[in-house]
Amino acid sequence: MNKLSSFELFWLMFMLYDSPYALMLLHYLAQAQGLLAAEMLILAAFLGQAVLYMAVKRAEQNLQVNAKPNLFLKMYFYLSAVIITAIFAEMLAAEFLNLTPKWAIALLFLVPSVYLAFKNMRNIAYLSVLLLPLSLIGYVMLFLGNAESFSLMNVLSFAQDNARFFFSLAHILPFVMQGAVLMVLYRGLAAPECAFKVSSWALWSNIFLLLGEYILSCGVFGAEESARLLFLPIELARILRIGDALLRVEVFSVWHWTIAGVLSTALFLDLAAGSVEKEAARRKIIFLALALWLVVAIFDDVTAVNFLFEIGIVVSVGAMAGLIKQKRSGRREK
């Protein structure tokens, strides 16, 4: 197999780090512009289907996989309809039925996703392709609407003013990660089994995120007790505010959780799939981790300290996974 270059690792990081902001902006535009944003969503679904078709055909060529594009496209039509329906149902439920957005997402998005995942784990991985054209369209619409507002600080300000919706984007992050995995499959750099393992992890992490939001928003436990119960860093308790009608979360929490997910995914693909040597993977991960930590430290020193600790855990777990994979491969060769 070819090696993953530094640029490709950076692209994996960029996709995961950037997509939540694009989706957040697209949601804001959907509320402000209505029908135009709805048409853009439908267009994004068809663009995503074209991307999926090309990815499946390329995977056939590179991995000699007996893929069935027609089956994948049919499944993607269904998943596209589910996510688009969930977006509109969220708006209608909040307007007419007084239902919170998380209930609409849980009923119309999470339930069929879990069913499809348990029925055939590989089906759920292709849901994330829809997020790629959404990211492009969100930024293009924002730039055409008001070029002066296109700045990172305005995005951060909007995220803090709409913290509840921004926290709900954390449920989408695992699916965005699967989009990065699909890109690796497209390049022929990882075995399908590796991608399906990551897909299953993303599914379960999404379920636990939803469960965690319910527990924290109920206010039964305190912030620190809830964090311990969910095996989350105590630093998350500092930024959660219990007791308000809305569950408010600072933007920095999503930052370092997302980046940690990127690093673990990149390291897992590098070491477990055997696409690069162990030393080369270690150098790339350490370089990216330190660079990202420096950026986070500029904005928030407490988050930087916790993030540095999380990097150590991620690198250690990834290295152990790589060593176990190498030992198993050695036993099979003997």
Model-derived features: where do they sit?
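Membrane-water interface regions at transmembrane-helix termini and the short interhelical loops
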Residues: 27-31, 61, 87-93, 109-131, ...
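Hydrophobic alpha-helical segments and their helix-loop junctions in multi-pass secondary transporters
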Residues: 78-89, 117, 133-159, 217-218, ...
